[in-house]
Amino acid sequence: MDIEMNRLIIRKHGVIGMALRKARASDLTRVMEIKESVVPLMIESGNTQWSEDYPDLERFKEDLRMETLYVFEEEGCIKGFAVVDDDHPYPYDDIPWELTRADSRALHRMAVDPAYQGNGISTGMMEEIEDMLIEKGIKGIHTDTSLENEKMQYQFEKNEFEFKGKLNLDDNLDDWYVTYEKVFEDDGID
């Protein structure tokens, strides 16, 4: 197993035991448990971005195969997950991003187990993702979420992502998404 896959990135807040790492095949059951626990809450709040059928196990297996699925773990318990890749959907071309595709990565399919929501896990995950990307020379993140997904929009805004516009991903004019970008601060170190 390669070192990168097992590398743990300890939170800059100094909270020991919390880390973002690349997912392993053995994590897929827990990823699906989290997904299945958030879907009813999403639907209850009027957000139909995810469903029983999406994202499915095959989607996460593909993310795993592409080495883009990450889990956020604390004391051996996976509390959340996210996909970080360079898959910028074609409609992203219509958004006035500050950064190019080459200079950024896309954040997709992020969730936190409802049992741990409200404890800073989303913020911790986003900070760890940012640290990981900065370390790799990436300058920022592009992302989107359903117009209905107010909780995720709140998380993006709380974590200093800038609203960039609306887009339609599915050619369904009733299904709009909002886009966000975070450009990482340049610390002046080269």
Mark where each language-model region is.
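Conserved acetyl-CoA-binding loop-helix of GNAT-fold acetyltransferases
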Residues: 112, 118-131, 154-158
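C-terminal "cap" of GNAT-fold acetyltransferases
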Residues: 99-103, 158-159, 169-190
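Conserved GNAT-fold acetyl-CoA-binding loop/helix
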Residues: 39-59
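Conserved beta-hairpin
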Residues: 67-85
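Conserved GNAT acetyl-CoA-binding A-motif
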Residues: 126, 133-145
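A short beta-loop-alpha structural element at the N-terminal edge
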Residues: 19-33
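Conserved acyl-donor/pantetheine-binding loop and adjacent beta-alpha core of acyl/acetyltransferases
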Residues: 83-109, 117
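Conserved active-site alpha-helix within GNAT-family acetyltransferase domains
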Residues: 123, 135, 148-165, 173
